Amino acid sequence: MNDLLPEQSPAWQQVEAVIRRVAASYGYSEIRMPVLESTQLFKRSIGEVTDIVEKEMYTFDDRNGESVTLRPEGTASCVRAGNQHGLLYNQIQRLWYMGPMFRYERPQKGRYRQFHQFGIETFGLESADADAEVILLSARLWREFGLADQVELQLNSLGSNEARANYRDALKAYLSDYESELDDDSKRRLESNPLRILDSKDEKTQKILEGAPSLSEYWDAESKEHFEQLTARLEAAGISYTLNERLVRGLDYYNRTVFEWVTTALGAQGTVCAGGRYDGLVEQLGGKATPAVGFAMGMERLVLLLQEQGKLTPRRVVDAYLMPLGEEAELNAPRIAEQLRNELPELRLVSHCGGGSMKKQMKKADKSGAQVALIIGADEIAQQLVTVKPLRTAEEQQTLGWQALIEFLQPLTRG
């Protein structure tokens, strides 16, 4: 688990603001779900033999003996909320969410046991147009963040559920001949979830997989047509991609389209965004059959990538520091501060509290990171003036009337 400290928050706020703006530009609405859900929700959706359910979920019994889990991902919760509140049946919904998720896994660079995800979920649209839309939305985010040259889109199709099952059987039959040579995790997965072996990082297992059947050989005609329509739309929109037939995703609910955005900018190749189509999940969780497609983006890795590429320029926490010198100034400081906030709502103004000498207050003003100190004493109060002292430049201090002060401070609100 990790804290986000005050000096880190502005970078996150900058990232969140871009995400909110881009999601809104595609007509998506925010949904907020609880972080605590019934354990059965994730067992039914993610799959009981996945690593997440078997090893990584934070699960416990509440006081009523009900098994509950801190959400490890957002899609299942979003579907549950949509079913529960009647948002999905016979409707088109474009939803987004952002918030903390929890997985008990080994902490590493950009990965924590409490982490944050931004997710997009589209319901009620079966055509490849919807798949293209969510991928285009994610691509726009990379462009907005200035990271388009740091990420690569990898794309695959799992075909229909029947095609996936047929491929699963063929892959299992092939790998059974090499069972003794597989790594321990792959041996365990051979019976329960052989598709996950395609994700193995073991070099010997990867060598064995080179001769494995190809997933595309098992695509049904409709899935093949759907995938061709998707790639045609991406190509028409100028989105380049790499076909990766070993891309299967770690959650059981996917069918047809799956995709990942990967980067090598954080060291070894890592995934920073992943998603796909999950047409059966809504019905699986108690709703009516509803097509759906979406993605999730890991925000810790996104922020880290932006920082390492020098792409974050968060706004200052403080623009101006108001220094009242003397009792009369201290009495009037709250009134003056509120008037400034009324005139300049975007101004980040700290008003000194607790009195003290000019030297002491100036030290605190400098430490705050403010661009200017606003000094008021008895003379300034009497004449309705404010003395402005720049703290980050060699400019001379000046004493200004109210309107001149507002005009002076206005540019700071854009910094």
UniProtKB/Swiss-Prot annotation:
The gene is hisS. Pfam families: HGTP_anticodon, tRNA-synt_His. InterPro entries: aa-tRNA-synth_II, aa-tRNA-synth_II/BPL/LPL, Anticodon-bd, Anticodon-bd_dom_sf, His-tRNA-ligase, HisRS-like_core, HisRS/HisZ, HisRS_anticodon. Belongs to the class-II aminoacyl-tRNA synthetase family. The keyword Ligase applies. Disulfide bonds: none annotated. Its EC number is 6.1.1.21. It is an enzyme of class 6 (ligase). It catalyses: tRNA(His) + L-histidine + ATP = L-histidyl-tRNA(His) + AMP + diphosphate + H(+). It comes from the Bacteria. This is Histidine--tRNA ligase. Keywords: Aminoacyl-tRNA synthetase, ATP-binding, Cytoplasm, Ligase, Nucleotide-binding, Protein biosynthesis. Its main location: cytoplasm. PROSITE patterns: AA_TRNA_LIGASE_II. HAMAP family: His_tRNA_synth. PANTHER family: HISTIDINE--TRNA LIGASE, MITOCHONDRIAL-RELATED, HISTIDYL-TRNA SYNTHETASE. Homodimer. One of its GO terms (cellular component) is cytoplasm. GO terms for biological process: histidyl-tRNA aminoacylation. It is found in: Cytoplasm. GO terms for molecular function: ATP binding; histidine-tRNA ligase activity.
